[in-house]
């Protein structure tokens, strides 16, 4: 197997797919900014942590179970099939509290996120609708991860991009021609993963398919084994929720709703950026796990180096685009032409995105550690960048430098985490079953 050729095949297709996934919220934000102005952008940014939490569970279960599946398949273990069925069953159970919250207390959730009375009134039905579709968001992650690990990254990419295209088109149709407003945007976003799952299901009718659904009761043991390898994905997604929540409260204190709206612009482009680096990590994961399952450690390390090199190159391209087109990007979400919001978002984009020179390598390394069955190290890396370092840096730097301190927290936290990650990667690695 030509590892380099396979690496770029899997990674390129996965990047496109995950960029498509991030467009769920990016499209929402653009159309809602046109329909509801600054308050609409503020609402979306307050909802982001809820999306992140849903995606975090989907990522942990889906990527973790698929990684277990890939390792066991490479070792010829028949029990590999049980992980797919268990992932679907457990995701549906975990989705129940989200659905109940959406049905009975969406307003309370928005208040907890820092929304005032106007924002709560604006976003009540939007929040209710997307929370009720939680099982589909989670299962979409699982289907995509397993189809990719079963040797069909192209179908996974097509499924994700098709769902995203549906979301973009019907966001516009539901919000404007049909005049459904924000609930229409939520409905378009909620239906998108249903379409993606339907397309992924084609894999089960192909000759290359080795996946089967095993009739079984949900197993806590299999779930824990899956989550051990998917924890880096969970913390990676959760880190976005933590970062967004902490930044929202700091910015509300420093600049009010306009500060949160400015961060909404930064955060939405950050979703796309993070998706690119997750695409590198998740695209390499099936190949790394296969090498690990066959005890080809040199091949796994080669893939890690390819991943980090690719991440650095992409970070340079990404920052060049952000630096060169900052005003254009900000204007897309500034339908009210607020000079203050534009000023905040302009400096925020240019400072915040410096962090991706470090974050790209951290995301790839955390994915590698999970793929080679080193969940403890993967968790340490992910918790550092997602919780410990970012919260500490944001509190300290915002107190010292105000708004610019908030933006600087992300690159500072990622730089600290990269030093820790290099130390963890240099620790001796053993082959485990």
Predicted regions: what is each one?
Residues 53-56, 167-171, 197-201, 271-275, ...:
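Hydrophobic transmembrane alpha-helices of multi-pass small-molecule transporters
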């Amino acid at each position: 197997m030509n590892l380099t050729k396979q690496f770029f095949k899997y990674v390129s297709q996965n990047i496109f797919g995950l960029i498509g996934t991030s467009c769920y919220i990016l499209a929402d934000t653009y159309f809602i900014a046109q329909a509801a102005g600054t308050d609409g952008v503020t609402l979306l940014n307050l909802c982001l942590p809820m999306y992140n939490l849903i995606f975090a569970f989907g990522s942990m279960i889906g990527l973790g179970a698929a990684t277990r599946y890939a390792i066991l398949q490479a070792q010829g273990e028949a029990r590999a099939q049980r992980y797919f069925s268990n992932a679907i069953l457990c995701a549906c159970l975990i989705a129940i509290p989200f659905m109940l919250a959406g049905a009975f207390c969406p307003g309370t959730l928005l208040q907890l996120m820092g929304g005032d009375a106007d924002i709560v009134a604006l976003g009540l039905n939007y929040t209710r609708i997307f929370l009720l579709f939680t099982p589909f968001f989670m299962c979409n992650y699982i289907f995509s991860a397993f189809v990719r690990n079963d040797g069909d990254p192209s179908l996974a990419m097509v499924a994700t991009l098709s769902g995203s295209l549906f979301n973009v088109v019907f966001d516009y149709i539901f919000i404007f021609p049909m005049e459904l407003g924000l609930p229409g945007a939520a409905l378009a976003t909620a239906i998108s993963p249903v379409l993606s799952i339907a397309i992924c299901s084609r894999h089960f009718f192909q000759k290359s398919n080795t996946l089967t659904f095993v009739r079984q009761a949900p197993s806590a043991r299999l779930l824990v084994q899956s989550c051990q390898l998917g924890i880096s994905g969970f913390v990676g997604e959760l880190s976005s929720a933590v970062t967004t929540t902490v930044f929202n409260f700091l910015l509300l204190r420093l600049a009010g709703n306009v500060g949160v709206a400015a961060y909404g612009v930064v955060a939405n482009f950050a979703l796309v950026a993070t998706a690119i680096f997750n695409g590198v990590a998740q695209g390499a994961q099936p190949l790394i796990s296969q090498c690990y399952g066959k005890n080809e450690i040199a091949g796994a390390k080669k893939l890690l180096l390819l991943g980090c090199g690719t991440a650095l190159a992409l970070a340079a391209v990404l920052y060049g685009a952000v630096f060169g087109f900052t005003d254009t990007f900000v204007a897309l979400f500034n339908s009210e032409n607020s000079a203050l919001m534009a000023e905040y978002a302009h400096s925020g984009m240019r400072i915040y995105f410096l962090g991706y020179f470090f974050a790209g390598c951290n995301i790839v390394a955390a994915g590698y550690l999970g793929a080679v069955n080193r969940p403890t190290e993967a968790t340490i890396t992910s918790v550092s960048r997602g919780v410990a370092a970012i919260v500490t840096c944001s509190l300290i730097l915002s107190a010292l430098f105000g708004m610019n301190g908030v933006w600087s927290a992300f690159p500072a936290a990622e730089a600290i985490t990269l030093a820790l990650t290099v130390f963890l990667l240099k620790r001796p690695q053993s082959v485990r079953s």
